[in-house]
Amino acid sequence: MDKKTQALVGQYARSLVEVAFEQDAVSTIQEEVRQILTVFAETNLKTFLSQVNVTSEAKKESLSFFQESCSVYMNNFLEVISLNDRANILYDVLKLVLELFDQEDNTYDVTVTSASPLSEEQKTRLLTIVSQKFEIKTRRLVEKIDEELIGGFVIKAKNKFVDTSIRSQLQAFKMNLK
């Protein structure tokens, strides 16, 4: 994404976040953004809206489906996106909106990659420790399995990264031997 588009995405995202806080509709807009992003993930809507050969009218019609079930604030936002012919950046705008909300209330998803599945007790303890060490509120734990780690785990949250995997320790040991 070029700098001009990135600036545009930021401008639209900040505008929606501002409205959410001004109108005390943060939780409503967060939920609506998540629902729309789910539709993006489950369909080819992002590709469709990015196509230059798809008419503005067709894109507007696609966005109108969301307007039927969204708040007045989201409806207005989607209307502005349509009127300004910016449907092609909607996905990026919505992703940034969630990031801005996260930054505002210091709440983040925690991604844990481990060699084998974690027990519920381990997940709970891990969320508590991450919350304290990273000084964040944790929303949920996203668990990934990567058997190549051999043992240990990798944690990612709020642009922070902790790697205690045996694989990384072996790689570090190998580098020290050279």
Swiss-Prot record:
Domain of life where this protein originates: Bacteria
Main location: membrane
Record's bilayer topology term: Peripheral membrane protein
GO MF annotation, one: proton-transporting ATP synthase activity, rotational mechanism
SUPFAM superfamilies assigned: N-terminal domain of the delta subunit of the F1F0-ATP synthase
GO cellular component: plasma membrane; proton-transporting ATP synthase complex
Keywords per UniProt: ATP synthesis, Cell membrane, CF(1), Hydrogen ion transport, Ion transport, Membrane, Transport
InterPro entries: ATP_synth_OSCP/delta_N_sf, ATPase_OSCP/dsu
Membrane-crossing residue ranges in chain numbering: none
Lipoprotein keyword on record: no
Subcellular location: Cell membrane
HAMAP family assigned: ATP_synth_delta_bact
Main function: F(1)F(0) ATP synthase produces ATP from ADP in the presence of a proton or sodium gradient. F-type ATPases consist of two structural domains, F(1) containing the extramembraneous catalytic core and F(0) containing the membrane proton channel, linked together by a central stalk and a peripheral stalk. During catalysis, ATP synthesis in the catalytic domain of F(1) is coupled via a rotary mechanism of the central stalk subunits to proton translocation. This protein is part of the stalk that links CF(0) to CF(1). It either transmits conformational changes from CF(0) to CF(1) or is implicated in proton conduction.
Similarity-based family: Belongs to the ATPase delta chain family.
Subunit structure, as described in the record: F-type ATPases have 2 components, F(1) - the catalytic core - and F(0) - the membrane proton channel. F(1) has five subunits: alpha(3), beta(3), gamma(1), delta(1), epsilon(1). F(0) has three main subunits: a(1), b(2) and c(10-14). The alpha and beta chains form an alternating ring which encloses part of the gamma chain. F(1) is attached to F(0) by a central stalk formed by the gamma and epsilon chains, while a peripheral stalk is formed by the delta and b chains.
Annotated protein name in UniProt: ATP synthase subunit delta
Organism lineage string: Bacteria, Bacillati, Bacillota, Bacilli, Lactobacillales
Gene behind the chain: atpH
